[in-house]
Amino acid sequence: MRRTTLIAIAAAVSATLAVSGCDSSDGDGKAPRKQAAPKADGQSINAHPVSDLKQGGSLRFGIDQWITQYNINQVDGQQGDAQDIITAVLPDLFDSDAKGAIHANPNFLVSAKVTSTSPQVVEYQLNPKAKWSDGKPLSWKDFQAQWKALNGSDEAFEAVDTSGYEQISKVEQGSGAHGVKITFSSPYADWQRLFDPLYPASYIDTPEKFNKGWSQKALVTASSFKVGRYDRTAQTITLVPDPKWWGDKPKLDSVVYRVIDSAAETEAYLNKEIDQAPALLPEDYKRLVKAPDTDIRRGARWDEVHITLNGGRGPLKDVEVRHAVSAAINRDGVNESFSKDLSFELKPLNNHFFMPNQEGYQDNSSEFDKYDPEKAKKLLDAAGWKDQGEGKPRTKGGKQLTLDYTLSAGSTSSATDQAELVQQMLGAVGIKVSIKQVPANDYFNKFVNTGNFDIVSFRNVDAVYQTMLTPVFISPKGKNLFQNFGSVGSPKIDELLTKAAGTTDHAEAVKLYNEADVEIWKLGHSIELYQRPQINAVRKGLANFGASGLGDTDYAKVGWLK
């Protein structure tokens, strides 16, 4: 089972800072030593054979908000915690190891391979033991229904991402009762990311079922765990072992997700209410590293923190105003203001598709994210926003240049500090920023996902395949923003992303993604800040869990040491 394997949208409110490398001063008052970034395959999970684990016990997590959509392929299902939960109870056909290499999951697949390249044909043999919790076997019909819902041919299905699925021409029964045969109309290199997780056909085969059927709970499951209880009053979601599971029996009795404000997670961990907490902020790290019975586990994850600019409304519809905002924000200053007390130096991230520890990374930011407040002023002058003097917002047509920075009420102090820094920097060039706090449970559903903001900051995580980022940068279609919440895109970017997804030549794909990245910077889509490594405080006796880096977590193998 995975913990966030699709691209997840995780609010920067959950922690805007990253700590990595070796231990800091551990609270001794000395300045921490700056360390190099972790290796691409870096992970720390306290690995043990299952025989070392005792039977029983619970694993408890904090989540940011109550889940209101469990169909993560639907536009409202993009909250990271929802993806964590649903990928733990639905079939994940492929798993990623510590180096990011993809392997078929034998619990669901006997085999999966490309059997023809012209046209591209992929054939799966499903595990005959694999069944949904309603007793029906997994079959080619599940694949067909998911393809029809996600291929973009019927816009009534509010799909968050059609890439890959729209390149499939046919889904049919393959060899034998458990075979699936998928034919592509054009090559698609990342075919393993499709149908992962897999949803049951009879619960997503109409727009009504697809869009609304999963809005309150996971209707059907097929994994080592199932949802045992949704407790809206206690704000908890409890997973329990599924007795019908055909694979290795889980060691844990339950996995409990509890809604906790991000700022309260450290206290909840110290009070032994949860078993993991992010040790990302200096004030949290100093407390957690000294907590009894605690390991600090570190990993190198695909995890970026950025600021999204909404080009779909207001002053930011003008690309020159977006460039002015970028030029007015000192990324080094924002990052350094947080990293000064950390053991890891937060260097500016200059690529939207690749992390610095990945093959393919190059700096494509050009002049578009260089700190230059004088340039910002000139851009605003040229855009018709007149300077009204120091400390006053610029005006145009009698209107003040004012932007909202939307922030969750559950934000950490660092997220609030970041918003205030941006407010000060933009104020210095004549842009008034109002920090707008909204209820944590509404942050994504009513604001981010709907484009109801001017400026927000959150994270994109676990983009093991670059095609997973397609919905972040493709042009919206009508009211469907996909994951391009700021509505900034172009036909040229769409074309480059389509070409990149369609080539099976890895070097060519890397080249095309970097070409698309150049165009994304030119449009002022977003302001990249930094890559965020994993730093987690975890109970010392917990095995096969912690900071998994690029790898996936198999919850059937997670448990407490004897």
Question: What is each of the regions a protein language model found here?
Answer:
Residues 329, 347-389, 409-415:
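Structural transition elements
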Residues 232, 386-462:
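Ligand/substrate-recognition segments at binding pockets and active sites
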Residues 52-54, 125, 159-207:
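Surface-exposed binding/hinge segments that line
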Residues 536-562:
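Long beta-strand-rich cores associated with HINT superfamily self-processing modules
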Residues 59-117, 148, 220:
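N-terminal lobe/hinge region of extracytoplasmic solute-binding protein
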Residues 52, 428, 432-443, 449, ...:
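Extracytoplasmic/peripheral linker and loop segments enriched in polar/acidic and small residues
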Residues 99, 196-250, 254, 373, ...:
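Gly/Pro-rich hinge or "lid" segments in bacterial periplasmic/extracellular proteins
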Residues 241-287, 432-434:
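Ligand-site clamp/hinge motif
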